[in-house]
Regions:
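C-terminal regulatory/oligomerization modules of transcriptional regulators
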Residues: 2, 76-99
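Short, Lys/Arg-enriched charge-dense amphipathic segments
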Residues: 15-18, 63-68, 89-99
Length: 99
């Protein structure tokens, strides 16, 4: 079975059980902008596999001693780093380095 990592499949209770993070903390992560679960038409949160991975990242950073503001900065820097790597790869494909 091929699970699309962006497909919102999991309720908050399932996400909490799978990740070991209680539902209230998941709501706090959302309030702080660290997590953006999809919403059904009725407003129910639904989490994708990718979001479950992000919850794991957040939990690991918190366990390492960072506070939520520090976690936010690390996640922003990681996203920026990924974007820069993609841009570098694109430029390398566009014009190979002359040796």
């Amino acid at each position: 079975m091929d699970l699309n990592t962006d497909r919102a499949l999991f309720s908050i209770s399932v996400a909490a059980e799978v990740t070991g993070v209680n539902p209230q903390m998941l709501r706090i992560y959302e309030q702080k902008g660290l997590l953006e679960p999809h919403r059904t038409e009725g407003g129910t949160r639904r989490y994708s596999t990718r979001e479950l991975e992000r919850i794991g990242e957040i939990a690991s950073l918190l366990a390492a001693g960072l506070n939520l503001a520090g976690v936010e900065q690390v996640l922003l820097l990681r996203a920026e780093n990924l974007e820069l790597r993609r841009e570098i790869d694109h430029l390398r494909r566009k014009k190979p380095l002359v040796t």
